[in-house]
Amino acid sequence: MRLGVLKEPEGETRVAIVPKSLRKLSKSGFEVVVESNAGITANHYDSEYEENGAIVSNRTEVVKSPLIISIHLPDVSELHAGQVIACVAD
């Protein structure tokens, strides 16, 4: 299953998945697609995600994933029917 990781809004310094978690997800059968610069504010770079098996892409591609994970609830206008969203909805 494809799992999308979104870049958080301005002011958020966390990222939903750090690069070292990717190998375990891959072994569990997930293909992880990370929005470019998603981890930058948490000091995780695109190259780290790629080195650990993720595909780094643009937001348009990431939100096509059937499973989305983020800290904040994404803009619902970007989502489609049947998607599963895992987030911390404050």
Feature roles, as predicted:
Residues 2-90:
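An N-terminal-biased, well-structured beta-alpha scaffold segment characteristic
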